[in-house]
UniProtKB/Swiss-Prot annotation:
It comes from Clostridium botulinum (strain Okra / Type B1). It is an enzyme of class 2 (transferase). The lineage of its organism: Bacteria, Bacillati, Bacillota, Clostridia, Eubacteriales. This is Hydroxyethylthiazole kinase 1. It holds the Pfam family HK. Substrate binds at M42, G191. The gene is thiM1.
C-alpha cells in the first residue's frame, strides 16, 4: 500500500478545489476545505467552469440542489477535467428521489470523467441497482450488502465508490475498506456528507491511491467528529468544533485512532 501521508501531501500543495455544490451547504464546504488545508473555489457559471477546472487540482460536483444551469456547468466542467487530467468527485445527493440526477451522472461518465462517487448507503445501493431505503436525501438503510454495492458500482464506473452510514464502506472494485469511527452527532448537522465529499476531493488531488485517500478523508471527518463531540454535545457548537478539529487533524492521528478493516 502506498505511503499513507495523505493529509501531509495535501497540505504541502494547498490544492485548489473547484466546487459545484448545493446552496444549502456551500459555505460549510468552503470553510471545511480551508480548515483542512485546501483552497476552495465555488465557481459554477457555465461560461467560466471549463477554464477554471483547467487550473484546479480537483473538481467536486454535488447534486444536492441541482439546477439546469448547474447541470450544464457540471457536464462542461467534467469535460475540462477529462481534458486536463483533473480528478472528479461526484456526490449524488438525493438521487433515489430525483431520477434526473442519475442521468446527469451517466452523462458526466460518458463525456467527462469520474474518479470518486461518495454518497450515503441508500444512494449508493440505488445507483448499484440494489434495493435501498431512503427518505428524501437521507438514508434509512442498515448497511447490509453496502460493500457489495460499492464494489459493483466501482466496476460499473471504473472509479472509487464510498458509502457512508453507521459504518462507512469504500471500494475500487477489487480492494475495499470498512471504517467504524464516527459519532451520531454528524447526522444532526446539515451538510456533513457534503463536507465529506469536499474532503474527498482535497485528499485525492495529489495522492495516487484514491482508495487510501478516500479512506483518509472519511477517517478525518469521523475522528474530527468524535473529538468535537467530546467538547460539544449540541448541534450548533458541534458544527463549529467539527471544523476546528478538521483544522488540527493529522495523518498520525487518523491512522492510529482509526478503526479500519481493509478488504
Amino acid at each position: 500500500m502506498e505511503n499513507k501521508n495523505v493529509i501531509q501531501k495535501m497540505r504541502e500543495k494547498t490544492p485548489l478545489i473547484h466546487c459545484i455544490t448545493n446552496y444549502v451547504t456551500i459555505n460549510d464546504c468552503a470553510n471545511i476545505l480551508l480548515s483542512f488545508g485546501a483552497s476552495p473555489a465555488m465557481c459554477e457559471a457555465y461560461d467560466e467552469v471549463y477554464d477554471f477546472v483547467s487550473i484546479s487540482s480537483a473538481l467536486y460536483i454535488n447534486l444536492g440542489t441541482l439546477t439546469k444551469e448547474q447541470e450544464t456547468a457540471a457536464v462542461l466542467a467534467s469535460i475540462s477535467a477529462k481534458n486536463h487530467n483533473v480528478p472528479v468527485v461526484i456526490d449524488p445527493v438525493g438521487c433515489p428521489a430525483i431520477k434526473r440526477k442519475v442521468e446527469v451522472i451517466n452523462r458526466i461518465a460518458e463525456v467527462g470523467r469520474i474518479d470518486i462517487i461518495k454518497g450515503n448507503i441508500g444512494e449508493i445501493k440505488f445507483l448499484a441497482g440494489m434495493d435501498s431505503e431512503t427518505r428524501g436525501v437521507d438514508s434509512l438503510d442498515n448497511g447490509e450488502n453496502a460493500l457489495d454495492a460499492c464494489t459493483q458500482l466501482a466496476k460499473k464506473y471504473n472509479c472509487i465508490v464510498a458509502a457512508t452510514g453507521q459504518k462507512d464502506f469504500v471500494s475500487d472494485g477489487k480492494r475495499g475498506s470498512v471504517i467504524k469511527n464516527g459519532t451520531e452527532m454528524l447526522t444532526k448537522v446539515t451538510g456533513a456528507g457534503c463536507m465529506l465529499g469536499a474532503l474527498c476531493a482535497a485528499t485525492c488531488a495529489n495522492f495516487e491511491d484514491k482508495l487510501v485517500s478516500t479512506t483518509a478523508a472519511i477517517l478525518s471527518m469521523n475522528i474530527a467528529g468524535e473529538k468535537a463531540y467530546e467538547k460539544a454535545q449540541l448541534p450548533g457548537s458541534f458544527r463549529i468544533a467539527l471544523i476546528d478539529n478538521i483544522y488540527m487533524i493529522s495523518d498520525e492521528e487518523i491512522w492510529e485512532r482509526g478503526n479500519v478493516e481493509w478488504k
